[in-house]
Amino acid sequence: MTLWINGDWVTGQGALRVKRNPVSGEVLWQGNDADAAQVGQACRAARAAFPRWARLSFGDRQVRVERFAGLLESNKAELTAIIARETGKPRWEAATEVTAMINKIAISIKAYHVRTGEQRSEMPDGAASLRHRPHGVLAVFGPYNFPGHLPNGHIVPALLAGNTIIFKPSELTPWSGDAVMRLWQQAGLPPGVLNLVQGGRETGQALSALEDLDGLLFTGSANTGYQLHHQLSGQPEKILALEMGGNNPLIIDEVADIDAAVHLTIQSAFVTAGQRCTCARRLFLKSGTQGDAFLARLVAVSQRLTPGTWDDEPQPFIGGLISEQAAQQVVTAWQELEAMGGRTLLAPRLLQAGTSLLTPGIIEMTGVTGLPDEEVFGPLLRVWRYDNFDEAIRMANNTRFGLSCGLVSPEREKFDQLLLEARAGIVNWNKPLTGAASTAPFGGIGASGNHRPSAWYAADYCAWPMASLESDSLTLPATLNPGLDFSDEVVR
């Protein structure tokens, strides 16, 4: 039984799904997808549970969410192993994901009060109040790269605000979704408040097509995000939050410490085997001997990165990609770039057929035109050389995406210029592109999102504002508008 609907584990009526470890091929999880009827059943359960859940005090909802945080802490080792084995990432990185899930609870509680919550301003004849109300039934679509942390960033603030939820994990990480759902079950959520439906495209289409859905919160690829936006077009009554990918630029200016700059670049481009939406995809490097030295050092250090299994000791920096198919897609993208005129500096290699262990790739594209503006979701970095900083910014902005952007430079003036001219939701200075503060919004513009950033701002799209003018008594105003006569004299 792999679906959680209305407080019960049930067997899916859709196609059989088998999840294997992407490196070893070991079967980790299997079960049947939810069919359209079961998706509808989950929605009805969430709708029935909504009034009572929304009427609970914030404190009552907070207690259950904090109980979930405690369960994450006490089950950290087990959940870490599940995420690592299912995604292929090393144990150390999966552990940081579970820690981020735990920390998200306190952050979301604080954000609710700061970003939403209630406010009251006294007026001479009463008061002006601002309250926030939950939307109702929300669908949450989870991605595979952070199958615990990223959907958690939607689910927790949505529950705190009083919404009920239908959660569909990525079809590539059903085991992680199952494990997290079982912890929510132990936290004592009332039946129907949070429902789990497993499945791929058909399940997702059935979920997003539900008429009785009040909104959809999505993290994933731009292609899927565009499809969801099209599917929900003409329905302004539904909240839609899209956090999508990026073709992210990193600009390397003058650097005093080449190794520090190389470390930052590797952390930006290759962490999580390049499977973060904020990863650097395009590197813009200043022409000259210093740039040459940096590039040679980057290739040399990147060449030493050997992906390994989730439990290898010592731990590798990167593990496998989510699937062998995903790894092969990166290799194919590199081959296509080379065919277009790119100069390979470091060729990506599949270490073994039948696995997703892929070494990083670096290819120089200076002077090559007609390149597709697409995100390659893996450890492949394209390099361009530039002559002046204005040119670097123009090249960085030459994309339909707008998620993250970064600058390595000792000059504050150049960072200030980038802040004014960059088209990105995250702009970092001498910090990896993959770094973000939990107390800041997370999201992008253009093809990277629809201006509804998550993280600190998630509370904003999980509730709608209700403004009120209030007075505990009703009296006739001392001064009336022109043309109003409330005298006792009878007009004939």
Curated annotation (Swiss-Prot):
UniProt family annotation: Belongs to the aldehyde dehydrogenase family. AstD subfamily.
Pfam families per UniProt: Aldedh
Active-site residues per Swiss-Prot or TrEMBL entry: 243, 277
Known pathway: Amino-acid degradation; L-arginine degradation via AST pathway; L-glutamate and succinate from L-arginine: step 4/5
EC category: oxidoreductase
A molecular function (GO) term: succinylglutamate-semialdehyde dehydrogenase activity
EC number(s) from the headed UniProt entry: 1.2.1.71
GO process annotations (BP): arginine catabolic process to glutamate; arginine catabolic process to succinate
Function (record text): Catalyzes the NAD-dependent reduction of succinylglutamate semialdehyde into succinylglutamate.
Keywords on record: Arginine metabolism, NAD, Oxidoreductase
Reactions that this protein is recorded to catalyse: N-succinyl-L-glutamate 5-semialdehyde + NAD(+) + H2O = N-succinyl-L-glutamate + NADH + 2 H(+)
Origin organism lineage: Bacteria, Pseudomonadati, Pseudomonadota, Gammaproteobacteria, Enterobacterales
Binding-site residues for NAD(+), renumbered to this chain: 220-225
Alphabetical list of InterPro entries matching this protein: Ald_DH/histidinol_DH, Ald_DH_C, Ald_DH_CS_CYS, Ald_DH_CS_GLU, Ald_DH_N, Aldehyde_DH_dom, SuccinylGlu_semiald_DH_AstD
Organism: Escherichia coli O81 (strain ED1a)
Protein name from the UniProt record: N-succinylglutamate 5-semialdehyde dehydrogenase
